[in-house]
């Protein structure tokens, strides 16, 4: 027995078994206590309510919706609304972050100072306050008759942001998206299977020339009959008709998340650019490369490899930040779950759905980013997030 106790591996197994037993006992006790509490209140835990109609409506939906639709469809719409908000926020936050990161590393004192001021303001003001601030501005824009026009195609008003949209079938949108994603996956795959870089760049250039032609062809063939290819918004009476509308709640949240996330991503990009060894940059100058080529072929590729793990964390945080939509009345996943709890009383089931939904989204983001990180990592220098 003494020899077993002196064995380090045996002690570690015993310690882990004790900890797991304690955790399991606590979980069982929590489940039993919750079950007893629900039985005392004559409440049941079941998911049959998902097939009942909601009986209530909400302001924005990416899919057609009516009050007779089920809770199941309502949950799906809330999840899609959150994905839309999160995707737009992450996209624009990334663009802003790249610009801010470049400005922060600039040798120009004015640009560098402006970048610092931006980061300090938007990073230190709570996101929920920024959301309320931008919503108060967007909702007080002029009425449709006095809307701000941009090229007679884009209109800003207190009822939302109106912009042109293609009159094409939904299947074509899905097909074009799949083609674009397939091409982006194909590029890194073929890069590792072609020995000559010149051959790879030739295929890459040809693909980027052919792909837009294919996408335009699909859009033209899939357009709705007897309608123009592009549907422009136009003022008819007291409101705009045609085109597509982004409601003020969504617009304000996208602005808030993009500016807030851009400050953090800007710092991540700045750190990545500064992490590139000075010797490699000087080696580029020695080989006769110009500043642009040094940045695009040496500094930027190495910086991307360095920032991906931190960028993954920022994307996950920004996706979770979409829950502030309830403050301005945007029908995101969190708001719809909260309303469903009030209407149905199925608290535990709906909270489980909420946690499962965000867990699925964030694990997917982490998986995609980690896969990209592994694909572009230099062997021996992999960084795990």
Name every feature range the model reports, one short phrase each.
Residues 1-385:
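Transmembrane alpha-helices and adjacent helix-loop boundaries
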């Amino acid at each position: 027995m003494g020899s077993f106790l002196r064995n380090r591996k045996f002690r570690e197994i015993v310690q882990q078994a004790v900890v797991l037993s304690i955790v399991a006992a606590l979980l069982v006790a929590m489940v039993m206590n919750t079950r007893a509490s629900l039985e005392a209140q004559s409440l049941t835990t079941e998911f049959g309510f998902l097939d009942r109609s909601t009986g209530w409506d909400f302001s924005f939906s990416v899919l057609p919706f009516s009050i007779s639709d089920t809770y199941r469809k309502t949950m799906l719409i809330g999840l899609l609304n959150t994905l839309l908000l999160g995707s737009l926020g992450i996209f624009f936050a990334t663009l802003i972050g790249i610009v801010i990161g470049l400005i922060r590393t600039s040798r120009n004192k004015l640009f560098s100072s402006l970048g610092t001021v931006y980061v300090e303001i938007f990073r230190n003001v709570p996101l929920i306050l920024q959301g309320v601030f931008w919503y108060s501005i967007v909702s007080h824009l002029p009425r449709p008759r006095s809307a701000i026009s941009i090229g007679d195609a884009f209109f800003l008003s207190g009822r939302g942001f109106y912009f042109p949209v293609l009159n094409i079938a939904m299947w074509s949108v899905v097909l074009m998206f799949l083609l674009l994603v397939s091409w982006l996956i194909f590029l890194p795959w073929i890069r590792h299977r072609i020995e000559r870089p010149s051959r790879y760049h030739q295929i890459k250039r040809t693909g980027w020339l052919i792909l837009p032609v294919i996408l335009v062809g699909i859009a033209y063939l899939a357009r709705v009959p007897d309608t123009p290819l592009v549907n422009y918004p136009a003022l008819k009476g007291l409101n705009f008709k045609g085109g597509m509308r982004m409601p003020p709640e969504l617009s304000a949240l996208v602005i808030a998340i993009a500016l807030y996330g851009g400050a953090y991503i800007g710092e991540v990009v700045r750190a990545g650019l500064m992490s590139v060894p000075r010797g490699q940059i000087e080696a580029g100058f020695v080989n006769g490369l110009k500043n642009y080529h040094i940045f695009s072929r040496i500094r930027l590729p190495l910086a991307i490899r360095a920032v991906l793990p931190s960028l993954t964390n920022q994307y996950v945080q920004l996706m979770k930040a979409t829950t502030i939509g309830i403050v301005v009345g945007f029908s995101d996943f969190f708001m719809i779950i909260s309303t469903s709890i009030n209407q149905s009383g199925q608290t535990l089931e709906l909270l489980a759905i909420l946690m499962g939904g965000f867990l699925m989204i964030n694990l997917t983001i982490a998986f995609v980013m980690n896969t990209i990180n592994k694909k572009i990592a230099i062997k021996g220098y992999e960084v795990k997030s």
